[in-house]
Design a protein with these regions (language model features):
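Carbohydrate-active catalytic/glycan-binding domains of CAZyme proteins
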Residues: 1-229
Length: 229
């Protein structure tokens, strides 16, 4: 989890417990810097942590996705590799946020594999408006060391081609998890009804939703409906 204090802004931590019901105790700080959206997976090479942090030493500055090896569940190797970076204006979080530069956001990574392909889905843009979307990168690879896999962002000939984006009934679609049930993939995500009205800037209008995902040979598509799965 990530949390803030007077001197810390969204530093990533982990806690331990003898039961999933808790109590969780003894927090350990993984990174003494902004670090969010942890997603731990296990392969034959061990545990890997997908997460997001900032990079200002680049052309498209902002938040992007990294992966780091975990020595054990409470100890990162602290050798993160940048895996998914902003490449287009549709991934802008806020224009002019950092002086004369636009701030981009790629966050909420979720890794899984199907057949001979590995996928990392992510959320991009700004969660608070209709730019928020879900995209993915894919790799035709059997490598178990996820820091060495070369993922390629899915686009339409280099242009914006998200799996999920605003449609005629919802916006702000993102920050999802993926499950496979009886051979069918599903995305559990949040979004807002397109016609919702916020009472004020602090009103949270997003709700949890489910849709089918179709995953085949490096391509992911979503099947969304307003009234059923």
């Amino acid at each position: 989890f990530s949390c803030s204090s007077e001197d810390e802004c969204q530093f990533m931590h982990a806690m331990v417990a003898d039961s999933p019901l808790g109590p969780f105790m003894n927090p350990t700080c993984f990174y003494k810097r902004f670090s969010i959206d942890s997603h731990v997976v296990e392969t034959e090479k061990g545990l890997f942590l997908w997460y997001s942090e900032d990079n200002k030493d680049c052309v498209r500055i902002g938040t992007r996705v990294f992966v780091d090896k975990l020595i054990d569940p409470m100890t990162p190797a602290n050798q993160p590799r940048e895996m998914i970076v902003p490449t287009m204006d549709e991934e802008i979080f806020k224009r002019g946020r950092n002086g004369d530069k636009d701030w981009h956001t790629i966050e909420g990574a979720f890794w899984f594999f199907e057949g001979e392909w590995q996928y990392v889905m992510y959320s991009g843009g700004c969660f608070d408006n209709d730019s928020y979307h879900i995209g993915y990168v894919a790799a035709h690879s059997q490598k178990s060391d996820l820091t060495r896999v070369q993922f390629v962002k899915h686009t339409n000939n280099g242009k914006f081609a998200p799996v999920m984006y605003k449609n005629d009934f919802e916006e702000g679609s993102g920050h999802h998890s993926v499950i496979k049930y009886k051979g069918q993939y599903y995305a559990i995500y949040h979004a807002r009804d397109l016609d919702c009205q916020k009472r004020n800037e602090f009103d949270e209008a997003r709700t949890a939703r489910v849709c089918k995902l179709h995953v085949n040979d490096g391509v992911i598509t979503a099947e969304r409906y307003s009234d059923h799965i």
